[in-house]
UniProtKB/Swiss-Prot annotation:
A Gene Ontology cellular-component term: cytosol
Pfam families hit by this protein: SmpB (PF01668)
Source organism of this protein record: Chlamydia caviae (strain ATCC VR-813 / DSM 19441 / 03DC25 / GPIC) (Chlamydophila caviae)
InterPro entries: SmpB, SsrA-bd_prot, SsrA-bd_prot_CS
Keyword Cytoplasm: yes
This protein's encoding gene: smpB
Protein name as annotated: SsrA-binding protein
Keyword Glycoprotein appears in the UniProt entry: no
Family: Belongs to the SmpB family.
Length: 150
C-alpha cells in the first residue's frame, strides 16, 4: 500500500497546532483527478465544514486541467468527504470545542484514489510561532554539534 503526497498544506503546519489527524476520501471528477496528478492543487485557505451529517471540503483550489475542454471543473467548488458516520460525529465533537477547526494537511494517492489527511487544529498565537522557531534552531544546533564530534 504505497501512498504518494501530491498536495501539502505547509501553511497549516506553521499557523496551527495539530491535535489529531484523520484520513478521508474525496469525491472528485475526472478532470480534478488528472489536474491533481499534475500537482495542480492548493490547500492554503481550505477548511472542512460539517453540515447535515456530511463533511465538506471548502475553499480548496484544484487548477483546471489544461487538456480539459468544456467539461472542465470549477476551481473552488464544494467537495464531499467520504467518512464513516462515527468519524463525522467525532469531528463534530472536536469542532464544538472552542478554538478547534478542521484543516486539510495534505492530499495523497493511495491505490489510485485521492485521499486527504485532515487535522483537528488549534490556531497558534505569535508567541507560539516564535517558540517553535526557537526550538527548531536549538535542535539544528544540537544536530550540528553532534555531527561535528562524531
Amino acid at each position: 500500500m504505497s501512498s504518494k503526497e501530491i498536495v501539502s498544506n505547509r501553511k497549516a503546519l506553521r499557523n496551527y497546532e495539530v491535535l489529531d489527524t484523520l484520513e478521508a476520501g474525496v469525491v472528485l471528477t475526472g478532470t480534478e483527478i488528472k489536474s491533481l496528478r499534475d500537482h495542480g492543487g492548493n490547500l492554503g485557505d481550505a477548511y472542512v465544514a460539517i453540515s447535515k451529517g456530511e463533511a465538506w471540503l471548502l475553499n480548496a483550489s484544484i487548477a483546471p486541467y489544461r487538456f480539459g475542454n468544456i467539461y472542465n471543473h470549477e476551481e473552488r467548488r464544494k467537495r464531499k468527504l467520504l467518512l464513516h458516520r462515527y468519524e463525522i460525529r467525532k469531528l463534530e465533537g472536536r469542532v464544538a470545542q472552542k478554538g478547534i477547526t478542521i484543516i486539510p494537511l495534505g492530499m495523497f494517492l493511495s491505490r489510485g484514489y485521492v485521499k486527504i489527511r485532515l487535522g483537528c487544529c488549534r490556531g497558534k498565537k505569535a508567541h507560539d510561532k516564535r517558540q517553535t522557531i526557537i526550538a527548531r534552531e536549538k535542535q539544528r544546533e544540537v544536530e550540528s554539534a553532534m555531527k561535528r564530534y562524531r
